[in-house]
C-alpha cells in the first residue's frame, strides 16, 4: 500500500512515474481502481518540471482538470510533510471510488454517516432565564466519522487520548486493522521528496 522512495539517493528519491506505477500496482490486477491522486504543491511542481501533468477539458467546456497518468490531481498543502529543507518527505495519496466513507453505526458502516454518542439528545431547563419565564435548551450530539474502506478501528492494546479519537490517535497504526485483501482497498501512498 505504501511505496517509500524517500530514502533513495538523488533523483531516485523524488516523485516520478516509477514510484507512481509501483504504488498503483500494489493493488495488482485492480490497479485501474485508482481515480485520483492527492499531492502537495511541491509534488505538483515536480510533475510540471517532468512535463507529466496533463490538462483535460470537460465535455461541456470551461472546466479544466489536471491529470497525472490518467488520474485526477488534487493539490492540498495540508498533506503530511516531514523533515526540513532538502530532506522534506511528502506523502501523496492515491484514491479509488469508495476509499473513504461515512460510518460508525454497527451493521451500517457506510450508510448513516454518524456514530452513536453516549447521550444523543437531552433537554435542559434554566428557570432564571428569560426574565424568570425560564428557558429550555435542546442538546443534540452527533459524532460524524470518516472511515477508510477495508479497515476496522480497534481499541484493544492502545489507549486513546480522549473518548473520541484525536488526529494523533487516527495516525497510529495500532488502532487500525485491515480486514479485506490489499487488492480490494482503493488507497495507496507514496512517500517521496520533491
Predicted regions and their residues:
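Structured, hydrophobic secondary-structure cores that serve as assembly/anchoring elements
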Residues: 1, 18-49
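Sequence/fold signature of self-assembling virion shell proteins
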Residues: 8-15, 22, 48-194
